[in-house]
């Protein structure tokens, strides 16, 4: 069986440096917000849900996955859409090394349609590393996803990613704001 994940880590350049002139102030607020994206989206919509696109185990591949876990033999990759009022607004991809999936963190592999953000932000041991941002050019894999979701777009999209630590065990969360998110409006 062929497994195809959206190559977020390998398809663009991620950077912790972003200037206000690079994007709008509204977009910057969304990209650099350290708080729970789940809570923010829930506050802005009447109906919030998580739609799991896929969850797969991969042997580490530098072509598909981030360099953060290159020493890991296996990584769990979870791809979801965050949906507000029946519109997908964020595509999220999480990389969880198998070494993280021990003890209390083993349940990360079984959260299904529950929000990972809710799990993370309720855990008192959680800490978040710096936020990195990336711009996805037109014709990228992310844009193909938008077409598949009937959200065609002719401008670059933005995403962010952070390493999170739960009981000092790492996982990487990447989030791309889709056109229906409304954050690209002036």
Swiss-Prot record:
Functional summary from the UniProt entry: Removes the pyruvyl group from chorismate, with concomitant aromatization of the ring, to provide 4-hydroxybenzoate (4HB) for the ubiquinone pathway.
Enzymatic reactions: chorismate = 4-hydroxybenzoate + pyruvate
Gene: ubiC
Binding sites annotated in the UniProt record for substrate: 78, 116, 175
Family in the record: Belongs to the UbiC family.
Pfam families linked to this entry: Chor_lyase
A GO term, aspect molecular function: chorismate lyase activity
Subcellular location: Cytoplasm
SUPFAM superfamilies: Chorismate lyase-like
Protein name, entry field: Probable chorismate pyruvate-lyase
A GO BP annotation: ubiquinone biosynthetic process
């Amino acid at each position: 069986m062929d497994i195809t994940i959206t190559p977020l880590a390998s398809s663009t350049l991620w950077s912790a440096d972003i200037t206000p002139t690079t994007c709008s102030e509204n977009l910057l607020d969304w990209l650099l917000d350290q708080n729970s994206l789940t809570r923010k989206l829930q506050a802005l919509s009447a109906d919030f849900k998580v739609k799991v696109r896929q969850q797969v185990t991969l042997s580490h591949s530098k072509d598909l996955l981030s360099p953060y876990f290159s020493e890991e033999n296996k990584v769990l990759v979870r791809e979801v859409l965050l949906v507000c009022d029946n519109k997908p607004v964020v595509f999220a991809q999480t990389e969880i090394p198998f070494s993280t999936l021990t003890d209390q963190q083993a349940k990360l592999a079984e959260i299904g349609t529950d929000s990972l953000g809710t799990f993370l932000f309720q855990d008192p041991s959680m800490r978040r590393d710096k936020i990195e941002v990336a711009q996805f050019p037109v014709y990228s894999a992310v844009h193909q996803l938008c077409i598949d979701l009937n959200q065609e777009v002719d401008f670059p999209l933005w995403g962010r990613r952070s390493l999170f630590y739960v009981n000092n065990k790492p996982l990487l969360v990447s989030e791309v704001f889709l056109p229906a998110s409304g954050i690209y409006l002036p």
